[in-house]
């Protein structure tokens, strides 16, 4: 089989399963409205959970940062790309979340890959929730360590895996809020069983940070858990992009020596770090509390309105509200019907989610209004 035949066969298989991914160019993709092809849609696909991507204070901070520092960092943080603004952001994140240190990364995917690649050796074991994000499972699969997956949020299964002999160290990996189902991990129980077996816990809280808990401190703070490694990302609740790893001082020093994604990547622009500082200030403020309260009210309204639809509603109290349809083609058809009626919704299909669980992944944000939720419910009931 030639290269072209191999590529064609893979694409043909995706088409046959109604699983071929495609991108839609949009004029505006975050916030309350999505604009595409000169048409405005209510946007129920964005991860901009607090509606901060268009916040004037954060926009001004980025603009001022660009004027002061330029539009690029100029290099890796190990060479010339680590600015006083990066340092200030790391210190503010560490203080906010109760850690000694924070290290910035260009994306959550890079952060997860870097940590697992740097920490895990051949004699070690990773125990990962089977529904963990692709960045975690891919990194674990590519690492030299043994990978064992435990049933979703099943602490008993996790305990059995950790109890089996392991010559090295054990790392338990999970998410705070799961990206495709919107449900939360039982972090306190997971941490307890992890500690019983002398393991470390790594939590990716991409979808919880900024959005839940006191001052938006996220899933771990809410559940009174402090994992050895906490990954937070800035493309969701913060409304920007990038990520950080929270850890002890010695682990931070270790990652600065051995995390290749950090060492060999150009740092995020200082202007971006300046915008993230402004976003963090909003998240921690009374305005942040008000946005979280508004989002919670929207979620309550939505869940009350979809109970009688002929779909499976995931057990989620988060901004991620999936309606599980099952069939790929049915999910695509529903998403298209909703778009035709002014609601931009994305169909998520295997392999992103397990086979037979194609869904409409609906996301609500503090930028929405109650009438937006009512319109979404009206359209869903008309096509249910």
Curated annotation (Swiss-Prot):
Q: In which pathway does it act?
A: Cofactor biosynthesis; biotin biosynthesis
Q: Single GO molecular-function term?
A: protein homodimerization activity
InterPro entries xref list: Aminotrans_II_pyridoxalP_BS, Aminotransferase_I/II_large, AON_synthase_class-II, AONS_Archaea/Proteobacteria, AONS_Proteobacteria, PyrdxlP-dep_Trfase, PyrdxlP-dep_Trfase_major, PyrdxlP-dep_Trfase_small
What does it catalyze? 6-carboxyhexanoyl-[ACP] + L-alanine + H(+) = (8S)-8-amino-7-oxononanoate + holo-[ACP] + CO2
Question: Per its UniProt record, what Gene3D superfamilies does this chain match?
Answer: Aspartate Aminotransferase, domain 1 (3.90.1150.10), Type I PLP-dependent aspartate aminotransferase-like (Major domain) (3.40.640.10)
What does the sequence similarity comment in the record state about its family?
A: Belongs to the class-II pyridoxal-phosphate-dependent aminotransferase family. BioF subfamily.
Assembly and partners?
A: Homodimer.
Name of this protein: 8-amino-7-oxononanoate synthase
- Name the source organism: Escherichia coli (strain K12)
Species lineage: Bacteria, Pseudomonadati, Pseudomonadota, Gammaproteobacteria, Enterobacterales
Gene responsible for this protein: bioF
């Amino acid at each position: 089989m030639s290269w072209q035949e191999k590529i064609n066969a893979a694409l043909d298989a995706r088409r046959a399963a109604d699983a071929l991914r495609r991108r839609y160019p949009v004029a505006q993709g975050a916030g309350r409205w999505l604009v595409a092809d000169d048409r405005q849609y209510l946007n129920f696909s964005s991860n901009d959970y607090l509606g901060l991507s268009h916040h004037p204070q954060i926009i001004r901070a980025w603009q001022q940062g660009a004027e002061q520092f330029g539009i690029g960092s100029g290099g890796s943080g190990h060479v010339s790309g680590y600015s006083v603004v990066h340092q200030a952001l790391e210190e503010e994140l560490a203080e906010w979340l109760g850690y000694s240190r924070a290290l910035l990364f260009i994306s959550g995917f890079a952060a997860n890959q870097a940590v697992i690649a740097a920490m895990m050796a051949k004699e070690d074991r990773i125990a990962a929730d089977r529904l963990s994000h692709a960045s975690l499972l891919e990194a674990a699969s590519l690492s030299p360590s043994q990978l064992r997956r435990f049933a979703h949020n099943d602490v008993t299964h996790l305990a059995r895996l950790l109890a089996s002999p392991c010559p090295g160290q054990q790392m338990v990996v999970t998410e705070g809020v799961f990206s495709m189902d919107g449900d939360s991990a039982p972090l306190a129980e997971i941490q307890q069983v992890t500690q019983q077996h002398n393991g470390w816990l790594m939590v990716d809280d991409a979808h919880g940070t900024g959005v839940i808990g006191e001052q938006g401190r996220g899933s771990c703070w809410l559940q009174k858990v402090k994992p050895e490694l906490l990954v937070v990302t800035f493309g969701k609740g913060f409304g920007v992009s990038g990520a950080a790893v929270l850890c002890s001082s010695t682990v931070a020093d270790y990652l600065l020596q051995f995390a290749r994604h950090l060492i060999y990547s150009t740092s995020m622009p200082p202007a971006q770090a300046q915008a993230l500082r402004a976003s963090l200030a909003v998240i921690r403020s009374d305005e942040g509390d008000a946005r979280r309260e508004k989002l919670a009210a929207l979620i309550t309204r939505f869940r009350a309105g979809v109970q009688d639809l002929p779909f499976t509603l995931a057990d989620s109290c988060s901004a991620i509200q999936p309606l599980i349809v099952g069939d790929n083609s049915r999910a695509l058809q529903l998403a298209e019907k909703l778009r035709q009626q002014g609601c931009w919704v994305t169909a998520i299909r295997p392999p992103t989610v397990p086979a037979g669980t194609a869904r409409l992944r609906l996301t609500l944000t503090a930028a929405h209004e109650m009438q937006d939720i009512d319109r979404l419910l009206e359209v869903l009931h008309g096509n249910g």
